[in-house]
């Protein structure tokens, strides 16, 4: 009986791997086409694009998707490695540094579910965090939020049992891709799956990309998406007064910039009066200072100059400074949880360390930083023990911020029962 059960799970895992592999192959094909377009204009970008491809589309992604469908408990057994233990310790320390040793008592989610880590007294003992898979309700994918066609579409992830009277907190996911390639799928699935399970609504967006567009079109679209969410998310059960944002790589740059430049009319042409503030940000392995070439991959500055900014840094340093989130740090910044891999070959972790330090120096009230040992760029794409631990830690961070907003209430209301009027 046990053998039959394992065989069945492995069979389902194989089918899932094929499906995910087909999707990833399609994404990689689109990426290669975009990369070819980039390289046509600048052979010097070969190293940058090749490195990005190897980081964003590794074979382990497909394997991780497959393993995630077999048995979360089985996967958990592999989490006792030194690297997983170190990641657990660092994530825990980052949250303790931000909120104190009893931070788990402050976590609150719409389901009222206590964090898995709190119940099991440690991230390594997680009994279950869902594998990366999309959770859409009817008519919640490819929704237009702006006039940009395919580049202005978003997906809404939500629980199917979310009651009409509910107002769930919202997390916006901004995809990475060197400001030039990739889209709203298949990034951040471990995190969004977890947040949806906890009763949140997640919104994954596309945005305009280079070389077809020039900076600041990218951030304008992200802010347009925030404005759309604030105006419309209540129709899908979301709370327009509690919006948070995340993203990886270029998406982290855009998420951080959006979080720090709320309601800046220069970045909101045509919708200057829209409220684009967010309540928290959790950027992964991002670029936060576009003026510091010493803290970049050697090919990043020429890449930015040629494809994204369409201007040389020496000719227009103000443009690069204005595009850098580190230029916008201030004492009223929303809470930040900054994450980076120690061995990131594409974006040095020094970018995140300097950014976190700048936030603290500016007087920002809540800044948490976790640098994960042995983690590379795009470490969260695969459904590994580490990516799931990171998702759980981010959910705890956002849960504390949400708990503050809700008056740090304990207990819960049933997700399927709207609040009493």
UniProtKB/Swiss-Prot annotation:
One Pfam family this chain carries? Answer: BD-FAE
Q: Which GO terms describe its molecular function?
A: hydrolase activity
Keywords associated with the record = Hydrolase, Virulence
Query: InterPro entries, per this entry?
Result: AB_hydrolase_fold (IPR029058), BD-FAE-like_dom (IPR049492), GDXG_lipolytic_enzyme (IPR050300)
Q: What is its EC number?
A: 3.1.1.-
> Which residues participate directly in catalysis?
249, 344, 377
Q: Which reaction does it catalyse?
A: hexadecanoate ester + H2O = an aliphatic alcohol + hexadecanoate + H(+)
Q: Which SUPFAM superfamilies match?
A: alpha/beta-Hydrolases
PANTHER family for the chain: AB HYDROLASE SUPERFAMILY PROTEIN C4A8.06C, KYNURENINE FORMAMIDASE
Family the UniProt entry places it in = Belongs to the 'GDXG' lipolytic enzyme family.
Q: What does this protein do?
A: Shows lipase activity. Is highly immunogenic and may play an important role in the virulence and pathogenesis of M.tuberculosis infection, by altering the balance of cytokines. Significantly down-regulates the expression level of pro-inflammatory cytokines (TNF-alpha and IFN-gamma) and up-regulates the level of anti-inflammatory cytokines such as IL-4 and IL-10 as compared to LPS stimulated macrophages. Also inhibits the expression of iNOS, TLR2 and transcription factor NF-kappa-B in LPS stimulated macrophages whereas the expression of TLR-4 remains unchanged.
Could you identify this protein by its name?
A: Esterase LipQ
* Natural source organism: Mycobacterium tuberculosis (strain ATCC 25618 / H37Rv)
